[in-house]
């Protein structure tokens, strides 16, 4: 719950342009190299736009322009796909020549370039780089992030009249 408050909420985006705008705002306040995360986009909710698409989804060109120095990773509402900019693909070593993983697809344009759309198991290619990025954080940075997540979750719960909750799936290290 707290983690969801730290990333871009893309559930209300009515166009790909809305998503690009949210990423641009996040990139303006992010340090170079800092990852930008989001979740909840769904192309069927978008108004038609005059932009390049492959298989009904825009390419990552617009996001590359607004966040050239920040890897961007945006998970589809279903969780079965994700959208990555070129910085995220580079961090993961994904190119147009990268083989599709078993059970996944790296969507490519007519020239064979990766468009940024990763389906199913192809998401794991970039998620491995995200795990490496998080592992590079100091223990103090990870602790601060967890503290912020708990604080944000508590604030959201209180705003809805929920005064207590627990998570039986969290280990003692995270508590």
Give the ranges of each region predicted by the language model:
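Divalent metal-binding segments
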Residues: 1-175
């Amino acid at each position: 719950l707290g983690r969801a408050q730290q990333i871009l909420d893309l559930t209300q985006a009515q166009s790909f342009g809305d998503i690009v705008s949210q990423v641009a705002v996040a990139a303006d306040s992010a340090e170079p190299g800092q990852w930008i995360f989001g979740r909840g986009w769904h192309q069927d909710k978008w108004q038609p736009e005059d932009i390049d698409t492959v298989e009904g989804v825009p390419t990552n060109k617009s996001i590359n322009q607004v966040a050239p120095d920040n890897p961007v990773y945006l998970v589809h509402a279903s969780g079965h796909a994700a959208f990555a900019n070129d910085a995220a693909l580079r961090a993961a070593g994904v190119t147009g020549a990268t083989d599709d993983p078993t059970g996944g697809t790296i969507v490519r344009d007519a020239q064979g370039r990766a468009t940024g759309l990763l389906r199913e198991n192809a998401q794991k290619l970039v998620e491995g780089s995200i795990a490496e990025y998080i592992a590079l954080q100091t223990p103090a940075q990870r602790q601060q992030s967890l503290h912020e997540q708990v604080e944000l979750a508590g604030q959201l719960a209180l705003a809805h009249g929920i005064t207590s909750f627990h998570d039986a799936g969290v280990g003692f290290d995270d508590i």
